[in-house]
Curated annotation (Swiss-Prot):
Record Gene3D superfamilies: 3.40.50.12240
Reaction(s) catalysed (UniProt annotation): ATP + H2O + 4 H(+)(in) = ADP + phosphate + 5 H(+)(out)
Segments forming a coiled coil: none
Protein name: ATP synthase subunit beta, mitochondrial
Family: Belongs to the ATPase alpha/beta chains family.
EC code: 7.1.2.2
Keywords recorded for this protein, A-Z: ATP synthesis, ATP-binding, CF(1), Hydrogen ion transport, Ion transport, Membrane, Mitochondrion, Mitochondrion inner membrane, Nucleotide-binding, Translocase, Transport
Quaternary data: F-type ATPases have 2 components, CF(1) - the catalytic core - and CF(0) - the membrane proton channel. CF(1) has five subunits: alpha(3), beta(3), gamma(1), delta(1), epsilon(1). CF(0) has three main subunits: a, b and c.
Listed GO CC annotations: mitochondrial inner membrane; proton-transporting ATP synthase complex
Taxonomic superkingdom: Eukaryota
Any one GO molecular function term: proton-transporting ATP synthase activity, rotational mechanism
Subcellular location: Mitochondrion; Mitochondrion inner membrane
One of the protein's GO biological processes: proton motive force-driven mitochondrial ATP synthesis
């Protein structure tokens, strides 16, 4: 409900665009969000007034595909900002799954993991992505990122 409210306000009240990047989403969740957006009028199937882009990498996809979803969503947001001159709200759900997918790719490439099992390039990967979320003279990107906490245990190093 909160996501829908924010997307609706950005699109209708402020005239901006929204990009939703679903990293490791369940098919049902992505489908539900899509249909909720149609029902609320955020996505219009009748004309070109929609101001939302949805990018998904399902949880059953290979880690390389899941790792690229957040970056693809960010690239779409950069296009809206730089080419269309729009302010953009970027949702990334879930940033932990982005990190997890990167860790899986790193393991497949034979890289030695860090002390808690993450890829040795985690700080660079995350920093590079976060630094692209910025304001320019043409528009801005504001990001809201959901974080999944494994087993709801904040002390879990995963």
């Amino acid at each position: 409900v909160l996501i829908m409210e924010l997307i609706n306000n950005v699109a209708k009240a402020h005239g901006g665009y929204t990009v939703f990047a679903g990293v490791g989403e369940r098919t049902r969740e992505g489908n539900d969000l899509y249909h909720e957006m149609i029902e609320s009028g955020v996505i219009s199937l009748k004309d070109k007034t929609s101001k939302v882009a949805l990018v998904y990498g399902q949880m059953n996809e290979p880690p390389g595909a899941r790792a690229r979803v957040a970056l693809t969503g960010l690239t779409v947001a950069e296009y809206f900002r730089d080419q269309e001159g729009q302010d953009v709200l970027l949702f990334i759900d879930n940033i932990f799954r982005f990190t997890q997918a990167g860790s899986e790719v790193s393991a497949l490439l034979g890289r030695i993991p860090s002390a808690v099992g993450y890829q040795p390039t985690l700080a660079t990967d995350m920093g590079t992505m976060q630094e692209r979320i910025t304001t320019t003279s043409k528009g801005s990107i504001t990001s809201v990122q959901a974080i999944y906490v494994p087993a709801d245990d904040l002390t879990d190093p995963a």
